[in-house]
């Protein structure tokens, strides 16, 4: 049996979005929608993808999806992510800690903070873009 891990994704890896096929290609399966603890901030990187950072100051909950990913596919998923995104530890609302996609601080310099939208899908929807298949917009 393959070893697997939960991976929290908050941007274009989510269901129906541009990079979601990268998760499916490695045999990942969707688990559920969730949110982070109130210690994160979110930026739009030129409206192509988000970058989420943990903060020691004022943060908020950010919407995300949890995926069950084979460990041997995790590196492939990470390597297909845009530069400046990395995998680190993400704290969920219930204080569970899972692996998740985070942005490096330099990536957010001079970019638009979108934390107030609550997540990437909400931000994209406000802009009139496609929000993928999250069970409510198919």
Model-derived regions, located:
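Glycine-aromatic micro-motifs
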Residues: 2-138
